[in-house]
Amino acid sequence: MRFDDSKYRKRFYPLSRLKGVEDLRVGIFTFGERLRKLFGETEFIFTPNFVPFEGLRENAPVILVDGKVVGFNPREVKGWEEAEEFARMGRALEIRGIFFENFWELPLKVEAVLENDLKMINLEGYYKIGEIYIHRTAKVSLKGEFGGWGLIDEGAVIKPFVVLEGGVYVGKGSLVKPFSYIVSSVIGPVCKVAGEISHTVFEGFSNKQHGGFVGHSYISSWVNIGAGTEVSNLKNTYGSVKVYSYEKEGLVDTGEIFLGMFAGDHVKIGINTTISTGTVLGIFANITAKDSPTEKFIPDFYWTGGGKMSLEKAIEMAMRVMGRRGVKPDEGYIDKIRESYG
């Protein structure tokens, strides 16, 4: 099995700026992890931006989800154009699932994906409190309110007076601090979170350790959100939210009423910053309260007040931050940072 995100990768910028679309998280798994679990033995080439709800029921040269071509067998089909032709001729297998067209859809379908992902987990090492499965190595205070459903994974820590509602996943080695209120969200591995979090995905290795609100947002890896940061996820007019598209090089109307922020890898947000509805923050963007309320688009490598971070400082910061979690970026990763800098 191989991935080819060339058609859609720019649609998921800045989230996919330093990694493939297959490495984006929605639910318990990344796109790639889920596809490997279901289709690991196949020879298919996949565009990874979809969540299958079932495996292959029968052999087929082309696979569809939501009417979109998501994969083909290179032994029978020469490429994506021919795969589209096969689909038009009715020579494709439609499977149940969710297809993601754009980055802003990721936090909006958390519960549907999470419900499906739970069916893929071997729950032998878990016990239940209400409708939440808890790994036996997790440390969970019972002085909380667990009215939701979902899964708390291996080595996670839930401190006292935490409220969990809706579908919630807390990833391996992550910490939820006291008095947190989490609704319909995914907290990926090795995160530290606090405050109010609603309909949001934390990809992994990112922190929001203090009070403040984040809603209908996607937080990439190696992001730090300072104390008192408030993210608007609803316009005062209750109108449709526009977001910046790297693909279109301008604002596009999403048709959605609730959208917060979309932060690329290595974003740093200072204390008491106010994030405008539907803000897109490019990789390595560094903003503070002086940038509040934020513009709709904060470009890659932005430095608070209107400057630009040097490439050397960005690489130095990445190595320092990742090193604190025992992760050493390889040359390929550093090269992607250089290429993104331009």
Annotate each language-model stretch with its function:
Residues 3-7, 82, 146, 163-164, ...:
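Short, flexible segments with low predicted structural confidence
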Residues 1-131, 297-342:
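Terminal amphipathic alpha-helical/low-complexity segments used for targeting or macromolecular assembly
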Residues 121-220, 235-236, 262, 280-281:
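Extended beta-solenoid/beta-helix repeat architectures
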Residues 179, 193-342:
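Glycine-rich hexapeptide-repeat left-handed beta-helix
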Residues 1-4, 80-85, 140, 158, ...:
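Short, functional N-terminal and low-complexity linear motifs
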Residues 15-18, 27-29, 103, 109, ...:
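Surface-exposed loop/turn and secondary-structure junction residues enriched for glycine/proline
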